[in-house]
């Protein structure tokens, strides 16, 4: 996993002030870098992965965030809520049509924040996601970027088996590329990422 999730979170909240805002959080079913501790007025977690949302709901209850978080199981393009900001966390590149997703986001909130992989990140090569990331980066360029900041982290794995487990859902090409690390231990793969305000 990334070397320091706290650093990723700190970079996010330093880039954009979420305090007092209603945030439509797209892709919230995975691990969350943004939570109510950022001072949000309301955090609306949106994801279509029901299993991931069940885990998120349990986490919300365990942390006592029931009054500050709402969970919506939906395809993002079907969401008709409004807020101050739409926040995509490492998921815009997974959208079928990133341009359409950004256009829909603009109808829901005046600000759009995207936290995602940089097109030149080595990590996306091993995840076999370079085409998807390039497509979402091009969509953001066309949409109009107000500001951006680039960061560097590393994905670290104890061994090749742990790396393969992380890449399991990425397809055959990712598994083939990961063979470069067969037999290796203490694997570190550079992960460049960006936070953008659209």
Predicted segments with their positions:
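Local beta-strand N-terminus motif with an aromatic residue
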Residues: 20, 82-84
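Class I SAM-dependent methyltransferase SAM/SAH-binding core
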Residues: 24-78
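Conserved Class I S-adenosyl-L-methionine
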Residues: 28-30, 132-198
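Helix-to-beta-strand junctions that scaffold the AdoMet/dcAdoMet cofactor pocket
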Residues: 65, 95-96, 109-110
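A short SAM/SAH-binding and catalytic strip from SAM-dependent methyltransferases
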Residues: 84-99
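Conserved class I S-adenosyl-L-methionine
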Residues: 113-142
């Amino acid at each position: 996993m990334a070397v320091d999730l706290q650093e990723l979170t700190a970079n996010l909240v330093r880039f954009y002030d979420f305090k007092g805002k209603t945030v439509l959080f797209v892709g919230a079913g995975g691990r969350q870098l943004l939570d109510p501790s950022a001072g949000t007025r309301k955090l609306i977690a949106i994801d279509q992965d029901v299993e991931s949302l069940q885990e998120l709901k349990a986490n919300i209850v365990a942390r006592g965030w029931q009054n500050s978080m709402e969970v919506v199981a939906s395809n993002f393009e079907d969401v008709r809520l409004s807020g101050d900001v739409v926040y995509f966390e490492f998921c815009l590149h997974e959208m079928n049509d990133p341009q359409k997703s950004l256009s829909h986001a603009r109808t829901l909130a005046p600000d759009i924040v995207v936290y995602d992989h940089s097109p030149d990140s080595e990590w996306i090569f091993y995840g076999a996601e370079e085409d998807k990331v390039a497509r979402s980066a091009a969509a953001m360029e066309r949409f109009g970027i107000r500001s951006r900041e680039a960061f560097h982290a590393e994905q670290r794995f104890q061994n090749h088996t742990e790396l393969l487990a992380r890449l399991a859902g990425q397809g055959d090409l990712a598994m083939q590329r990961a063979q470069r690390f067969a037999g290796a231990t203490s694997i570190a793969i550079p992960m460049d990422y960006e936070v953008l305000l659209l």
